[in-house]
Amino acid sequence: MPKQKTHRGAAKRFKKTGSGKLKRDHAYTSHLFANKSTKAKRKLRKAGLVSAGDYKRIRQMLDNLK
C-alpha cells in the first residue's frame, strides 16, 4: 500500500496552531479594495480559523504535516 501524501495545495494555505487548530487566511484580499470599508479591510488582515464543519476534511489532506 503506498504512503498517504500531503495535499500540497492545502499545505500552502493552512498552518497548525499550538493547540492543534488550523489557521487560514481570509479570501477577498487580492484586489477591489476601493469597494470595501476600512473596517472590512482591517478584519480581513487577521488570520481566521478553519470552521468545525471543514476541519475533518482538511485535516485528512494535511495528515503528515507537522
Swiss-Prot record:
GO biological process: one example: translation
InterPro entries named in the record: Ribosomal_bL35, Ribosomal_bL35-like, Ribosomal_bL35_CS, Ribosomal_bL35_sf
Signal peptide span: none
GO cellular component: cytosolic large ribosomal subunit
Region entry Disordered, spans: 1-26
A single MF term (Gene Ontology): structural constituent of ribosome
Alphabetized UniProt keyword annotations: Ribonucleoprotein, Ribosomal protein
Biased composition (Basic residues): 1-24
HAMAP family associated with the record: Ribosomal_bL35
Protein known as: Large ribosomal subunit protein bL35
Organism classification: Bacteria, Bacillati, Bacillota, Bacilli, Bacillales
Gene: rpmI
